[in-house]
């Protein structure tokens, strides 16, 4: 998906070495058995998709780590953090946080400036999402009947909590947004399609200008603005959380539709790194 890794990698009995830097590896079912403390590990990125609740992710702390970031929506975590939106609230008191989902990371940089400029009364989001490894390549059993169907053969409607999770990041929007997902037969890069009722009438030009100013200002690290006729493949390996497509904006009075692309792998991985740095450097 992202090409060859252009660094020198060597594999040993219990470690891999990248450009001379040794990284130990372990095979454990219980994170508490990994000797993070002995290794001097400050922060663990919990990316298994298994330990997404606070109590389970905190097993890494039992193993000696100081902080944990979950690469998924988390339950009962100290905070759900979308970098660029609410990461400034982090303090050293936060031990286990969620990086939210790739879709929430795309949606939040759209709704924040739009809500501040014209108010979002209510809205629905659809994410047209590349298939992932939680789906099947051919029809086979899965606890979710939709995800039991072949990812390469169908457009598959399924659920997402990405829109609802906006309320965890921006409390002023709690209960105002909902959404669903459609998994499609592409390997990477997804699309957020957001339709909302603004607090007043607006125009295509105003909506685009609000997001352009945000992309050039406070949200420049996570939001990009595009006025070229691009497609999903053009956004592969792009590090922004959200790539606003200004050519797709539609407005009818106070009813607004906007779209943004996101590399659901690479963009989200960059935000894991950003939030890791933000958490470790957070004030007391």
Report the location of each language-model feature.
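Short, intrinsically disordered, mixed-charge
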Residues: 49, 62, 116, 168-171, ...
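N-terminal Rossmann-like NAD(P) cofactor-binding subdomain of oxidoreductases
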Residues: 1-148, 250, 272-274, 283
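NAD(P)-dependent Rossmann-like dehydrogenase/reductase catalytic/cofactor-binding core
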Residues: 239-284
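C-terminal substrate-binding/catalytic lobe of Rossmann-fold NAD(P)-dependent oxidoreductases
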Residues: 1-35, 119-122, 127-256
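A generic structural signal for alpha-helix starts
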Residues: 105, 202, 266-267
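Acidic active-site catalytic centers that drive phospho-/nucleotidyl reactions
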Residues: 42, 46, 193, 263
């Amino acid at each position: 998906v992202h090409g060859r890794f252009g660094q020198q990698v060597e594999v040993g009995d219990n470690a891999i070495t990248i450009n001379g830097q040794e990284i130990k590896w372990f095979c454990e079912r219980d994170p508490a058995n990994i000797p993070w403390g002995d290794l001097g590990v400050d922060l663990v990125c919990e990316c298994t998709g298994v330990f997404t609740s606070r109590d389970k992710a905190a097993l890494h702390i039992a193993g000696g780590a100081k902080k944990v970031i979950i690469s998924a929506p988390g339950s009962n975590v100290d905070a759900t953090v979308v970098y660029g939106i609410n990461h400034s609230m982090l303090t050293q008191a936060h031990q286990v946080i969620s990086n939210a989902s790739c879709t929430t990371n795309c949606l939040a940089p759209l709704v924040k400036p739009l809500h501040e400029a014209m108010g979002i009364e209510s809205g629905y989001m659809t994410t047209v999402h590349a298939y992932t490894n939680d789906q099947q390549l051919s029809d086979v059993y899965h606890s979710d009947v939709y995800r039991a169907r072949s990812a390469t053969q169908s457009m598959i409607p399924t659920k997402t909590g990405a829109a609802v999770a906006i309320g965890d990041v921006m409390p002023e929007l709690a209960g105002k947004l909902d959404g669903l997902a459609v998994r499609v037969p592409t390997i990477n890069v997804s699309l957020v399609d957001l339709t909302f009722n603004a607090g007043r009438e607006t125009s295509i030009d105003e909506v685009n200008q609000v997001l352009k100013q945000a992309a050039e200002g406070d949200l420049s690290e996570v939001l990009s603005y595009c006025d070229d006729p691009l497609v999903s493949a053009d956004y592969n390996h792009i590090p922004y959380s959200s790539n606003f497509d200004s050519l797709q904006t539609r407005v009818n009075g106070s009813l607004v539709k906007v779209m943004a692309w996101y590399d659901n792998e690479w963009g989200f991985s960059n935000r894991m790194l950003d939030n890791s740095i933000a958490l470790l450097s957070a004030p007391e």
